[in-house]
């Protein structure tokens, strides 16, 4: 039981750290690319319509999810072995920081309940400097029970304020997590898109 508990803590911390680190890396790269251009006409991004969504399917993990056609899908460069795929919002200008949607699966040797994993996540988020915006039961589009938590991590040396939504659901000994990570200032803008992605998520096996 202790080993499983510690494994759960590690998985959650790695997930959060990987997500935040990835966003910081993109921000630094964007800032580094800014050279002699003194100004850039920033175009306000337009949320994709329903017809502009593609389907990502992974038979190995038995999952399926829809994502915007103008977002970048990547299965490489992910920082934790539990990560399956990440999706990044379009860059609108040279200093833009993309929002990130990360899908992961953690496998345990024993069956896990949604309630037990929820207690683990909530305990993990009870850290100094973490602001929990909300934590509530959630139902996926196909009726699968899940849970969601929205929180703001400690800012540290990050040059922007991130806001994170973590949704998790459980099937047998597998925990599936869907993480939305972006600038707090743009969090609400992409929220309808993220909600559609989350609602489209299916466990196919």
Language model region names:
Residues 76-177, 182:
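Conserved polar/disulfide-associated segments of primarily extracytoplasmic proteins
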Residues 55-57, 64-66, 72, 104, ...:
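Generic structural detector for well-ordered beta-strands
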Residues 70, 134, 148, 199-200:
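Extracellular/lumenal ectodomain signal focusing on beta-strand-rich modules
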Residues 2-28:
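Sec-dependent N-terminal signal peptides of Gram-positive bacterial secreted proteins and lipoproteins
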Residues 71-73, 174-205:
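Surface-exposed amphipathic alpha-helical segments
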Residues 27-52:
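N-terminal, intrinsically disordered, polar/charged segments of Gram-positive cell-envelope systems
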Residues 44-81:
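N-terminal "mature-domain start" segment
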Residues 68, 84, 118-122, 191-198:
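Extracytoplasmic/secreted envelope proteins and their assembly/folding machinery
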């Amino acid at each position: 039981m202790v080993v499983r508990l510690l494994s759960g803590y590690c998985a959650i911390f790695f997930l959060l750290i990987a997500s935040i680190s990835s966003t910081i890396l993109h921000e630094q790269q964007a800032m580094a690319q800014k050279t002699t251009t003194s100004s850039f006409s920033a175009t306000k991004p337009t949320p994709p319509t329903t017809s502009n969504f593609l389907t990502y399917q992974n038979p190995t993990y038995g999952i399926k999810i829809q994502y915007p056609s103008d977002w970048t899908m990547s299965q490489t460069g992910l920082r934790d072995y539990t990560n399956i795929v990440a999706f990044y919002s379009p860059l609108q200008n040279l200093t833009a920081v993309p929002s990130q949607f990360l899908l992961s699966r953690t496998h345990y040797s024993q069956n896990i309940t949604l309630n037990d994993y929820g207690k683990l996540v909530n305990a993990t988020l009870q850290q100094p400097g973490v602001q929990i915006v909300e934590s509530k039961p959630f139902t996926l589009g196909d009726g699968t029970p899940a849970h969601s938590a929205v929180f703001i991590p400690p800012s540290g040396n990050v040059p922007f304020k991130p806001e994170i939504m973590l949704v998790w659901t459980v099937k047998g000994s597998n925990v599936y997590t869907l993480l939305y990570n972006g600038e707090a200032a743009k969090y609400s803008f992409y929220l309808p898109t993220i909600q559609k992605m989350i609602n489209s998520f299916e466990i196919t096996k």
